[in-house]
């Protein structure tokens, strides 16, 4: 069936939907927070806390993660006005989390760290802790994506959207990271 002249004049062009596309939720929330809406920041926290938690879990002792998550979001709240592009909130807060993890290690070099293995007596917790330690020993490029996938339960596209990595990079990092993790688990278990 062909379109008539009347249909063409009264119908909405196919590209019009693209032009009127609403901004992403984080853009709306960042703008709302900058205008004084504190509930908007609570929603940003709910959206991005798993990302920050996963980044930290890949880099710092588990006992420190919750405090650092709170510290990072407090810092982000105070510095939100410096964010140039509201759509970049995810990569921006991910960068803050990575930097805070580096800062944590700088500060903790002079202090004695509590061994995570001493806190959990359950066999399941012990095995999970061993695997987490193996993940932490992987190259940084794989560590973060594996923790976000395996611990935080994010999908590949979610990891890409929240970290600023491309979907292809996430897939490659997950594939290579899992391959290395399997090799290390096999070596650890004598397979």
Residue ranges, per PLM feature:
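A short pre-motif secondary-structure segment
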Residues: 145-149
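DNA-recognition helix of helix-turn-helix
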Residues: 98, 102, 151, 157, ...
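C-terminal edge and immediately downstream basic/flexible tail or linker adjoining helix-turn-helix-like DNA-binding
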Residues: 1-14, 32, 130-133, 161-164, ...
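Short, charged helix-capping/linker segments at alpha-helix termini
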Residues: 18-19, 34-42, 53-71, 162, ...
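Short, aromatic/basic-enriched loop-to-helix "N-cap" motif that marks the start
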Residues: 67, 81-95, 167
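Sigma70-family region 2
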Residues: 34-35, 58, 62, 71-88, ...
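Arg/Lys-rich amphipathic alpha helix in sigma70-family domain 2
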Residues: 78-85, 95-116, 124
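A short, charge-rich alpha-helical start-of-domain segment used by transcription regulators
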Residues: 30-54, 131, 143
């Amino acid at each position: 069936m062909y379109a008539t002249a009347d249909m063409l004049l009264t119908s909405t062009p196919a590209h019009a939907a693209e032009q009127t596309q609403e901004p992403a939720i984080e853009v709306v929330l960042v703008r709302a927070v900058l205008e004084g809406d504190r509930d908007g920041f609570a929603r940003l926290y709910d959206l991005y806390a798993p990302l920050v938690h996963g980044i930290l879990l890949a880099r710092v002792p588990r006992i420190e993660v919750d405090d650092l998550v709170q510290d990072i979001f407090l810092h982000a709240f105070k510095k939100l006005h410096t964010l140039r592009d509201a759509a970049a909130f995810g990569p921006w807060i991910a960068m803050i989390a990575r930097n805070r993890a580096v800062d944590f290690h700088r500060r903790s070099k002079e202090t004695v760290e509590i061994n995570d293995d001493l806190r959990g007596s359950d066999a399941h917790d012990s095995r999970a802790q061993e695997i987490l330690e193996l993940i932490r020993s992987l190259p940084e490029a794989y560590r973060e994506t594996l923790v976000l996938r395996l611990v935080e339960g994010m999908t590949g596209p979610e990891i890409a959207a929240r970290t600023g990595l491309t979907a292809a990079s996430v897939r490659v990092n997950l594939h290579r990271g899992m391959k290395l993790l399997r090799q290390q688990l096999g070596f650890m278990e004598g397979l």
